[in-house]
């Protein structure tokens, strides 16, 4: 029985990794052994940072809402508590967007929530 060498398969696997390593510095873009380590690490970073991005954006929205609410003499925690009591169900992403781009709409929401403080 002849020996089965996995030439096609390993070449395909190498090409796939080297394609992902395109643009890396030094031997990391041409040497398979180095490239596979760099690609694995890059994919781990990408996975981790997709989760961190959600965390970072939530923090950004809270900062924007807090800054806009302080112009009306409130603080963020009071405002969010008043919104909950008022039954206004708007998420932080939309509130931050209103605070930045539609100041009149945000002001009306703040006025409605002030009654519940």
From Swiss-Prot:
Superkingdom of the organism of origin: Bacteria
Any GO CC annotation of this UniProt entry: ribosome
Protein name: Large ribosomal subunit protein bL20
InterPro entries for the chain: Ribosomal_bL20 (IPR005813), RIBOSOMAL_L20_CS (IPR049946), Ribosomal_protein_bL20_C (IPR035566)
NCBIfam families according to UniProt: rplT_bact (TIGR01032)
GO molecular function terms attached to this record: rRNA binding; structural constituent of ribosome
Family: Belongs to the bacterial ribosomal protein bL20 family.
Keywords: Ribonucleoprotein, Ribosomal protein, RNA-binding, rRNA-binding
HAMAP family noted in UniProt: Ribosomal_bL20
Native species: Rickettsia typhi (strain ATCC VR-144 / Wilmington)
Keyword Ribosomal protein belongs to the record: yes
Chain's role: Binds directly to 23S ribosomal RNA and is necessary for the in vitro assembly process of the 50S ribosomal subunit. It is not involved in the protein synthesizing functions of that subunit.
GO biological process, one term: ribosomal large subunit assembly
Gene3D superfamilies found in the cross-reference section: 6.10.160.10, Ribosomal protein L20
Gene this chain is encoded by: rplT
